[in-house]
Amino acid sequence: MLNSLGGGASLQITIKAGGNGGLFPSQSSQNGGSPSQSAFGGQRSNIAEQLSDIMTTMMFMGSMMGGGMSGGLGGLGSSLGGLGGGLLGGGLGGGLGSSLGSGLGSALGGGLGGALGAGMNAMNPSAMMGSLLFSALEDLLGGGMSQQQGGLFGNKQPSSPEISAYTQGVNDALSAILGNGLSQTKGQTSPLQLGNNGLQGLSGAGAFNQLGSTLGMSVGQKAGLQELNNISTHNDSPTRYFVDKEDRGMAKEIGQFMDQYPEVFGKAEYQKDNWQTAKQEDKSWAKALSKPDDDGMTKGSMDKFMKAVGMIKSAIRGDTGNTNLSARGNGGASLGIDAAMIGDRIVNMGLKKLSS
């Protein structure tokens, strides 16, 4: 429990430990569900609550201590040092560290600064969350955060009811994503419309609730895209390509999607060093990607996998311009709908990772 801090406002934030195991399905919960459904519902609730608490800490704690995000939001060394700089780095990082122990404080204080250079795969979850929230704010403000004079909210610091409304907005958005899927949730919320003053023009609990909902939706979407961007592959010869071990669980999910559309993706192929031509795998894409033999797969097959990754990214973004998503499989199945469904699962995987 952390109490804040100056500006005539009082805020209580409880940061809960991780420990959410397993992957939850992307489907609506139903009344009277089985105990396992209830457990999944509780897990989703815990993840949404934990992430909304963290996003509240990142958004408001620096400004309530007098620095605002402006001290940090000014260039990616200082820009993610923005959620880093005055907000999460240096002194506040130490303050959070002593308040919250070895968990969030050290992760926020040191993680954002040091981990950025090592790339997103090397980041701890709080550092990744900081990066995603910064990106969501950049999108919302049109890249103008470094021009925000006096902090994101100006001289008027948000009140405790406004901050609580923001937290609830984030929680509601993330709960909807985790429960119903991003693809089903995106069309149900109206994005926040800002005037020329940006966030400095926000006033009242309703506006801050919508801010939380907008940023929660954006962070959820970006969490899924980041999971796909982080997929790593390697090859040990011109004909042997592999998905890296830590990404094979997700590759299996994508392979199952590819197996639904053999007319689009065909079958994986492999080629031994002394062969002149490749041969078709007798196993599914899901198995070829997640449990490869020593020969791996050909570059052409890996390119097909990356094509599928790109389709799922487009589905997560809601990119209707990707004509591949309009394809129909044998029997009339919609590639776009199935890509959105696997995208929903990957978004949930990303959010779960952020809460760990």
UniProtKB/Swiss-Prot annotation:
Residues 25-38 have a biased composition (Low complexity). GO terms for biological process: symbiont-mediated perturbation of host programmed cell death. Residues 22-42, 280-300 are annotated as: Disordered. InterPro entries: HrpN/Z. GO terms for cellular component: extracellular region. Keywords: Hypersensitive response elicitation, Secreted. It comes from the Bacteria. Its main location: secreted. It is found in: Secreted. Pfam families: Harpin (PF04877). Signal peptide: none annotated. Belongs to the harpin HrpN family. Elicits the hypersensitive response (HR) in the plant upon infection. Harpin elicits HR in non-hosts and is also required for pathogenicity in host plants. This is Harpin HrpN.
